[in-house]
């Protein structure tokens, strides 16, 4: 069997580096690493590289440094299906759309944004009038939406890179009496799924975090057993809507 040691960084890249130093003092066989920030991760990863300890990144990539494998949701595809659903919901009339981005420098935000824009940028009638950074935070998502509604009162839809920001946008829309706005989030957390059931959110992209966790451990096990492992693995995501939830129930 294996002994699992966990450290949490609380979204703090500096704490993450301290955690890595503490972890390396234990001389682990392999490290599973979910970076706070893809850019800042390079310096933290360098500590493990210099120590000769193999690292598998999970969920977010490190933009520099060496890893033996990377495992994450297919965030590009997730952003794309969210964008396609918004296009479908707006129909031929199209309309003005808001994008609330995740934290700058994270691969999840970059990839979800990429997929979203692949879906909407070339669609006639769709105009992304606001694309601001909400840092995965509900209050920031709400503020972005409040400001967007003031500047663009005819907004028809929102894509938020996570459900937390989507819920903030939803509350801003409710306060403005704009429950008609199509809002799509990402993560399928419990509050968002309930909001989809209630018709307050149009949809949310569901990840499979359990597979990321078990898949990371499986990759580490195979590596330690001397087996060849994939350099990169994408985990499937799906769009959850009210119709789908009614069908599942």
Question: Whereabouts are the PLM-identified features?
Answer:
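A residue-level marker of the well-folded mature domains of exported/periplasmic proteins
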Residues: 1-249
């Amino acid at each position: 069997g294996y002994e699992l040691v966990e450290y949490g960084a609380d979204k703090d890249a500096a704490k993450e580096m301290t955690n890595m130093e503490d972890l390396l003092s234990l001389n682990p066989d392999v490290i599973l690493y979910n970076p706070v920030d893809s850019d800042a991760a390079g310096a933290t990863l360098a500590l493990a590289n210099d120590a000769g300890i193999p690292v598998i990144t999970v969920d977010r990539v490190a933009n520099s440094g060496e890893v033996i494998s990377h495992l994450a949701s297919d965030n590009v595809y997730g952003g794309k299906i969210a964008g396609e659903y918004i296009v479908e919901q707006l129909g031929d009339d199209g309309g003005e759309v808001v994008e609330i981005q995740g934290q700058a420098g994270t691969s999840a935000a970059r990839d979800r944004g990429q997929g979203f824009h692949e879906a909407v940028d070339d669609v006639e009638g769709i105009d992304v009038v606001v694309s601001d950074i909400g840092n995965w935070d509900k209050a920031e998502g709400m503020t972005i939406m409040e400001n967007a509604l003031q500047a663009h009162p005819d907004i028809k839809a929102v894509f938020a890179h996570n459900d937390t920001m989507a819920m903030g946008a939803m509350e801003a829309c409710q306060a403005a009496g704009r429950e008609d706005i199509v809002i799509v989030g990402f993560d399928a957390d419990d509050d968002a799924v309930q909001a989809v059931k209630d018709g307050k959110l149009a949809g949310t992209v569901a990840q499979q975090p359990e597979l990321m966790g078990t898949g990371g451990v499986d990759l580490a096990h195979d590596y330690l057993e001397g087996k060849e492992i994939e350099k990169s693995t994408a985990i499937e995501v799906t769009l959850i809507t009210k119709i789908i939830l009614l069908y599942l129930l």
